């Protein structure tokens, strides 16, 4: 993938072409008619590439994002439907096919700051060109609502409405400005005429969509900002929803795999004789190692793989257990997690080629003049995604083509990755995307899709490949382990005069280690310390690590200053009104300052991520060293909550996911391989351990933020700070399960 510069973007020649996510319909050539055959049935008319109308006046929104429980497809349909003035009872949605015309612009959106703001609502051609070139149809980064929705679906809905008005005006021979719309109806009061949208859909579809349709103001919204039933819930409740593992193809066989346990390993010796004797086993095949398999993370050290194909999953699993394989690990089978963190420590201390995220003021002078200097070091482990539905895909390769059934976060990217692995043109791969039983970033990487396609090509039969839970835990693209070192100066007035932070390694997003607090001198930076552990996006990416680090350290500074943690933060946020409002709200709703019984504690944390501000207060009870999370209170400012109930659900989901990680989550490396294998040693939060969660939404009117990830980063530091409040023990590394909290230990080997 070549590097896109601002000049390259501008010289694509399509910047001034039209409305953002109306897609190719706004570029020269108007390709809506060409796409109609791809996404429309006989009784449907594609008005523009994102919405179609049928003869019963039902509007179907075509959504270019995958559904993995986050409810984005419903919320995106809300945004289009509101601008279209559609009757919500006559709105449904379907996922866009994985073709370049429905690419999205997740990565391209990062250059918005370099594009004149006047073009932001109308630079579809720019982003579409970038998205197509990169093979992007990504669901991630909490961008579905704040980008596709805000700059795409709203404009598409408004454009469709204007096109339908224009079509009615031409037919009725009346001025367009005299026509009103309401609940999927066109109304001309002067002539007492009324007609459903469907009546003019065919005429509207022949028009060029307007490049800058008029959008509603917030006080005009009828669907945006209101709770509506999620359209995917009923089928998930009654069991009719289709996930990738539900797929059945005539003649289908099953496969399971084992990749080299030590990353980058290759097969040295293979004995499949016992496996082939098991009833139902059809074949045992091998798949090559690879250094590039697509997805956000690319691929690092992907070893060779053994696959057993059988008439059912169970005989495939039995066959895999019977395979005897010796691996060539190329000397990588002697290192451990302890060695990795020791390497991190050496590299931070050496500081070679340190890069700055933020450098301001004079940190050295602040340290020299400090009344008190506070230092601390934190670390977090590698984490697996632990999706409830393990990785799986069904593939059929025949006659120079491939058909694949899968649940993934980047259908277009997966299609291209599978094509490349098979040596096909992308047009020869048909991909059907299904609901996912969890994604969290793991299903943005295409390794499991490629495996299914390669096995199917080898056996020349449809193959459903299913990873075991053990494979799912041990062959993940993990959230990176990080070590982070801090030093701060407190002056004679009790103010934080400087903030220093060095960590390993830099990932995404760039702003994750930055702080919102008013500290004059700051030196925040990182050093490279690469390992051979595959890494990838994990719910809220680097915000989870750095949120824990920075919000724990600011709490330590409050304690060193003898200050209340909430009031200390509030003083440092005096010039950040949105941050302060969220902090004040969570403190108020949590009853901050109210006394707690001995053994109980309360902690607070604040993190801005993906355009959304979240503050959380955690209340815990510590009994005989065991921590019970009793209550979590969250305040969230997303600018505008498109679906308030959906937003709350995502914040609560993020809290539970983050609590699992903070309390139990840990992937450790032993002899070069992952030691954990299943939920007995990679524990997740269970229902009896789940706290009461209260979520309070602030619609500040700021830019629309994300929802799927911002609930996660603040929970770990709030929990750690609550434990300190209850016990006096400062938690500086996770997970919490590794601590013995029966004693008030401020410093120990575990806490260092």
Language-model regions: role of each:
Residues 1-752:
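Cofactor-binding beta-sheet edge motifs in enzyme active sites
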């Amino acid at each position: 993938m070549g590097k896109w510069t601002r000049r390259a973007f501008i010289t694509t020649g399509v910047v001034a072409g039209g409305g953002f996510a109306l897609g190719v319909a706004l570029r020269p050539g108007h390709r809506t008619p060409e796409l109609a055959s791809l996404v429309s049935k006989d009784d449907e008319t594609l008005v523009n590439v994102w919405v179609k109308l049928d003869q019963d006046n039902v509007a179907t929104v075509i959504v270019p994002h995958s559904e993995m429980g986050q409810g984005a497809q419903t919320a995106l349909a809300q945004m289009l439907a509101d601008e279209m003035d559609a009757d919500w009872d006559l709105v449904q949605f379907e996922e866009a096919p994985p073709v370049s015309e429905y690419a999205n612009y997740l990565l391209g959106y990062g250059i918005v700051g370099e594009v004149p703001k006047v073009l932001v609502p109308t630079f579809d051609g720019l982003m579409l060109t970038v998205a197509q070139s990169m093979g992007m149809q990504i669901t991630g980064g909490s961008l579905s609502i704040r980008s596709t929705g805000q700059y795409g679906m709203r404009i598409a809905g408004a454009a469709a409405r204007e096109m339908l008005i224009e079509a009615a005006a031409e037919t009725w021979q009346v001025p367009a400005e005299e026509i009103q719309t309401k609940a999927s109806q066109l109304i001309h009061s002067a002539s007492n005429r009324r007609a459903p949208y469907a009546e003019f859909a065919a005429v509207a579809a022949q028009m060029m969509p307007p490049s800058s349709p008029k959008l509603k103001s917030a006080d005009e919204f009828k669907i945006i900002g209101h709770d509506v039933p999620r359209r995917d819930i009923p089928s998930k409740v009654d069991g009719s929803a289709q996930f990738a593992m539900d797929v059945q193809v005539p003649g289908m066989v099953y496969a399971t795999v084992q990749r080299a346990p030590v990353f980058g390993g290759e097969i040295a010796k293979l004995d499949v004789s016992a496996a082939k004797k098991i009833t139902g086993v059809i074949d045992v095949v091998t798949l090559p190692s690879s250094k590039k398999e697509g997805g956000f993370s690319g691929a690092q050290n992907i070893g060779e793989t053994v696959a057993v194909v059988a008439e059912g999953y169970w005989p495939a699993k039995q066959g895999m257990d019977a395979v005897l394989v010796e691996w060539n690990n190329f000397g990588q089978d002697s290192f451990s997690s302890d060695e990795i963190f020791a390497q991190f420590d050496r590299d931070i201390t050496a500081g070679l080629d340190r890069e700055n995220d933020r450098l301001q003021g004079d940190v050295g002078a602040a340290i020299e003049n400090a009344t008190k200097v506070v230092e601390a070091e934190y670390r977090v482990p590698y984490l697996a995604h632990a999706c409830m539905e393990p990785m799986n895909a069904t593939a059929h390769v025949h006659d120079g083509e491939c058909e694949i059934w899968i649940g993934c976060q980047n259908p277009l990217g997966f299609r291209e990755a599978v094509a490349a692995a098979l040596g096909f043109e992308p047009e020869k791969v048909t991909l059907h995307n299904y609901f996912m039983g969890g994604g969290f970033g793991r299903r943005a990487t295409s390794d499991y899709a490629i495996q299914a396609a390669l096995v199917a090509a080898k056996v020349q039969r449809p193959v459903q490949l299913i990873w075991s839970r053990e494979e799912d835990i041990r062959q993940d693209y993990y959230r990176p382990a990080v070590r982070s070192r801090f030093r701060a100066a407190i002056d004679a007035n009790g103010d934080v005069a400087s903030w220093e932070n060095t960590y390993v390694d830099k990932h995404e997003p760039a702003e994750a280690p930055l702080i919102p607090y008013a500290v004059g001198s700051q030196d925040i930076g990182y050093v490279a310390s690469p390992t051979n552990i595959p890494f990838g996006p994990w719910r809220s990416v680097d915000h989870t690590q750095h949120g824990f680090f920075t919000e724990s350290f600011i709490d330590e500074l409050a304690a060193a200053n003898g200050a209340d943690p909430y009031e200390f933060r509030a003083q440092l946020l005096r010039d950040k009104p949105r941050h302060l409002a969220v902090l004040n709200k969570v403190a108020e709703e949590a009853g901050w300052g109210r006394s707690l019984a001995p053994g109980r504690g309360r902690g607070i944390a604040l993190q801005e991520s993906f355009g959304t501000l979240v503050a959380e207060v955690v209340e815990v009870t510590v009994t005989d060293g065991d921590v019970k999370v009793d209550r979590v209170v969250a305040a969230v400012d997303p600018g505008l909550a498109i679906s308030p109930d959906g937003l709350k659900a995502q914040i609560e989901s993020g809290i539970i996911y983050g609590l699992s990680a903070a309390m139990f989550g840990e992937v450790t490396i032993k002899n070069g391989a992952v030691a954990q294998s299943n939920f007995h040693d990679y524990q997740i939060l269970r229902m009896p351990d789940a706290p009461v969660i209260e979520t309070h939404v602030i619609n500040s009117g700021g830019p629309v933020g994300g929802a799927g990830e911002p609930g996660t980063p603040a929970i770990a530091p709030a929990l750690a700070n609550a434990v300190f409040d209850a016990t006096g023990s400062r938690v500086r590394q996770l997970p919490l399960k590794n601590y013995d909290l029966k004693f008030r230990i401020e410093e120990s080997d575990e806490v260092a």
